[in-house]
Every structure is written in C-alpha cells, then in structure tokens.
C-alpha cells in the first residue's frame, strides 16, 4: 500500500534536503534517497569514505560520498528491515500504522493552519544555516564572571582558569574507591556496568556530596508523552551533577601532587561527566533490562555522542554566543580558546557552537533533550546485540514520543521533528571529530594517565 503525504506542507528529505516524495522505509524521504537506500541494502553494498566519515550530504553533494549518505540514512531513521530481500517492488508493509498516524497528525496540523489563516513555514534547506536568534539572547556583559553554582562542595575558585581557562583545582588520579569503581572494572576490556561493587573493591565508592536527587514527577501540561515524563524523572539536576564533578576534581592529590595541565583537567571533567551519563543509562527503562554485554555494546557505540550532546545542551541553556560554560560552572571565552588551544580543538569548539546556535533557533527544550539523549543511547546501527528487538522497540517509541511532542507543542514549526533528527547527525559528526582529536593527543602522549575516554576509544577498536 502506498502512503501519501500532504504536499502543501513542503517537507524536506531528512537525508539531503530535497523535496520528499512520500513515506519510504520508515519515514518521509525524497525519491533519490529512497532508491539509493534500496539499492544499497538489496545489493549488500559496502562503501568507504575517503575523508573523515563526516561528509556534508545535501541535494547538490549527495552522490559524492555513498558511505556518509548511507550512514545518514540510518541515523535519521530509515529502516533496513523495511527493504524487501526479494528485489520486488514495494517495501515490507510493517510501518503502515505509523505512517497512518503520522499522516493523521499532519492533516490535523494542516487543518489548524488553514483555520488560523497562515501557511506553515519550514526550516532552511540542508546546508543553509538557520537565521540567527534575536540579539538580546546573546548579549554579552562587559566582563564575564563564573556563575555561583548551587550546592557546590567547596566551590571552584573564581580566579583565572589557568593558561586555557581551566579552573585551578588540585587533581588526583582516581583511586580504587573513586566513582568509577561502582560502575566499571579497572581494565575496560573486563569492565561491566553494575550497581554492585565488584572485586577487588570491597567497599562502596566514596563520592563527595549527597546522592543525586531527581525531579518530582513532571506533569508538563497536556499532551506530554508518558515516555518523556519518565525520562524527565531520570534526569539529574545540573547543579548536583556539577557539585559531584567539582568534588571529585578537588580531592587531594595522592600520587601526583603536581598541578595538571589545563587540557588534562578538561579530560578529567569529561571522564566524570561520562560517569554521570553511565549512571543515567543504568537507571534508564529498557537499558536496565538488557544483558550486561548489550549494555556495554550500546555505551561503546554512543559514549562520545552523549558527551557531545551534554555539552551542546549546556550551551543552549547558557545562552551566550562568545563563551562556553564548563560542567564545573566556569565560563571560558572563545577568544581564550582561540589563543590558547590548538587549531584542532578550536575548530571543534567553533563547530559545536554552530550547532548550539541552530538548536537555540529551534527552541530546543528539556523534554526534547531527554528524548534525543534516549534516541542516541538506543541507536539502531549497533551490531551484535543479543536483544536487538528490545532496542528497536525503544527507538521506535522514542521517535513516536518526540514526534507527538513536537507536533503538539510547536505547531508553528511543523518540521521540528525532522530538524532535531538532522541535528543528531551533526552530533555524531562532532563526536567522530572529537574522538579523532583525542586519539591524536593520545598518540602524542598528551593524555592523562588512567583516562577513561581513551579506554573507551581502544575498546571500540578491539
């Protein structure tokens, strides 16, 4: 059965930005990407990228790199299982109910638009930056001061942030009773994600500060999907995450009393942020039902994307164009990054800021953020899972919840759902660039000892 869509909504293909022709393999796409995806799957083609696997895919350049185009097809939600293996015309009719539901929502929206007497405006085509947000949201004061984080354990000093903007905090190599012990084994190849405290650690890890507390159930007004409400309850408060991380960074040095380089300190911040993300994942519905092996596989696949999204959303909330906010509450001017950081890190930060501006223009809210975070965790491109069906079901429910939420709460922005999924593509590209940067630093022997991020990189490669 052919599922049509309303052409006067002027939807754009989430892969290349061309005009969509209908529902193909799980979502609305153009005819070109439909044919490309079908040929790739049916012919079992394997592509390679001659660049860094982050090529720009738009209407004019979609044929230049089939590897990146196919990866983008998967990322935005095209379904491998929807392609017929017998090479006959037509896809496997598994998604009829979802298509009908999506079409009904769009028709309802079109009726709303006609009743209100205006035409829905879509976002800019692929490759065209969104219009800048209103200037008042990004006005900078004459001088920047670090905000006072709540509930900090001996809060970070307000003085200069070293030679690169990192707070001047004593650092120690995490001992056996650090936060890592409660989640992972000492060597990552043997680590697991557990709530118990495995040998050789006989006692629970001692973490500074009180345990995380989580928000009261959020009603969110009418029409907030149940999945999003549950995810909001799982999300820890930012000031408590900050307090924990600052507390860990301020532990007295045990084996290295020397003052660490600012880059080393940033790596420690990222380590501690990742530990908080692991804690979130362990409590996530569906994830906690998976076998440990599947949990590890999912985290190995998406750890860098979750870290990037965490940083991006912090900047969206922070709302300043010419500086960034670290997880510790410290502010760093981009001009400082330009002068003190290397060109690779500076370009990475600037690329991240471009995505921040895009999400700010899209009015990304907390409900959408937690849903995007969940979608990244349960990526469908992960191979060798023991329970792939559970992961697939979680992905489909999260997609449906995000679609419902955006259509209901942002009726003036009918393609917000697709725009958010496109932003996930950029999050992935950023994460790949960040991993390349970390590995470059690792090869130069510039990474701190016992760095969890490097262990994650090496585990992915083995």
UniProtKB/Swiss-Prot annotation:
Compartments it resides in: Nucleus
Domain NR LBD: 223-460
Keywords: Acetylation, Activator, DNA-binding, Isopeptide bond, Lipid-binding, Metal-binding, Nucleus, Phosphoprotein, Receptor, Transcription, Transcription regulation, Ubl conjugation, Zinc, Zinc-finger
Major localization class: nucleus
InterPro entries assigned: NHR-like_dom_sf, NR5-like, Nucl_hrmn_rcpt_lig-bd, Nuclear_hrmn_rcpt, Znf_hrmn_rcpt, Znf_NHR/GATA
Region (Disordered): 117-149
Mapped zinc finger ranges (NR C4-type): 13-33, 49-73
Positions with a binding annotation for a 1,2-diacyl-sn-glycero-3-phosphocholine: 342, 437, 441
Stored Gene3D superfamilies: Erythroid Transcription Factor GATA-1, subunit A, Retinoid X Receptor
Biased composition (Pro residues): 126-139
Residues with PTM N6-acetyllysine: 34, 38, 72
Gene Ontology terms: cellular component: cytosol; nucleoplasm; nucleus; RNA polymerase II transcription regulator complex
Post-translational modification remark: Acetylation stimulates the transcriptional activity.
Residues annotated with Phosphoserine modification: 203
Recorded family membership: Belongs to the nuclear hormone receptor family. NR5 subfamily.
Function: Transcriptional activator. Seems to be essential for sexual differentiation and formation of the primary steroidogenic tissues. Binds to the Ad4 site found in the promoter region of steroidogenic P450 genes such as CYP11A, CYP11B and CYP21B. Also regulates the AMH/Muellerian inhibiting substance gene as well as the AHCH and STAR genes. 5'-YCAAGGYC-3' and 5'-RRAGGTCA-3' are the consensus sequences for the recognition by NR5A1. The SFPQ-NONO-NR5A1 complex binds to the CYP17 promoter and regulates basal and cAMP-dependent transcriptional activity.
Name of the protein in question: Steroidogenic factor 1
């Amino acid at each position: 059965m052919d599922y049509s869509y309303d052409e006067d909504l002027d939807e754009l293909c989430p892969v290349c930005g061309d005009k969509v022709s209908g529902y193909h393999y799980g979502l609305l796409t153009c005819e070109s990407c439909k044919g490309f995806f079908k040929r790739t799957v049916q012919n079992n083609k394997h592509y390679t990228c001659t660049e860094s696997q982050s090529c720009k895919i738009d209407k004019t350049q979609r044929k230049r790199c089939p590897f990146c185009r196919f990866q983008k097809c998967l990322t935005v939600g095209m379904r491998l299982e929807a392609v017929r293996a017998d090479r006959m015309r037509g896809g496997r009719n598994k998604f009829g109910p979802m298509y009908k539901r999506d079409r009904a929502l769009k028709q309802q929206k079109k009726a709303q638009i006609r009743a209100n007497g205006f035409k829905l405006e879509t976002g800019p085509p692929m490759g065209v930056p969104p219009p800048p947000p209103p200037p008042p949201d990004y006005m900078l004061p004459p001088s920047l001061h670090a905000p006072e984080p709540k509930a900090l354990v001996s809060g970070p000093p307000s003085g200069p942030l070293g030679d690169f903007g990192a707070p001047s905090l004593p650092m120690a190599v995490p001992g056996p009773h650090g936060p890592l012990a409660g989640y992972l084994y000492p060597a990552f190849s043997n680590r697991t994600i557990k709530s118990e405290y495995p040998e050789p650690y006989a006692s629970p890890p001692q973490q500074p500060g009180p345990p995380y507390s989580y928000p009261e159930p959020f009603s969110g007004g009418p029409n907030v999907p149940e999945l999003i409400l549950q995810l909001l309850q799982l999300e820890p408060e930012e000031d408590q995450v900050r307090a924990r991380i600052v507390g860990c960074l301020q532990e007295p040095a045990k084996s290295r009393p020397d003052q660490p380089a600012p880059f080393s300190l940033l790596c420690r911040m990222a380590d501690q942020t990742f530990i908080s993300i692991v804690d979130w994942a362990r409590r996530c519905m569906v994830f906690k039902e998976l076998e440990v092996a599947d949990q590890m596989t999912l985290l190995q696949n998406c750890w860098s994307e979750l870290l990037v999204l965490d940083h991006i959303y912090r900047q969206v909330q922070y709302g300043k164009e010419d500086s960034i906010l670290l997880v510790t509450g410290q502010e760093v001017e981009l001009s400082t990054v330009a002068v003190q950081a290397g060109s690779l890190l500076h370009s990475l930060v600037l690329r991240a800021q471009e995505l921040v501006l895009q999400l700010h223009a899209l009015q990304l809210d907390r409900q959408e953020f937690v849903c995007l975070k969940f979608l990244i965790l349960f990526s469908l491109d992960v191979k060798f899972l023991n329970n792939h069906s559970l992961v697939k079901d979680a992905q489909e429910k999260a997609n449906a919840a995000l679609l419902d939420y955006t259509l209901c709460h942002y009726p003036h922005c009918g393609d917000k759902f697709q725009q958010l999924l496109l932003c996930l593509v950029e999050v992935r590209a950023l994460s790949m660039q960040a991993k390349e940067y970390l590995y470059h630093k690792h090869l130069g022997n510039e990474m701190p000892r016992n760095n969890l991020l490097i262990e994650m990189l090496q585990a992915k490669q083995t």
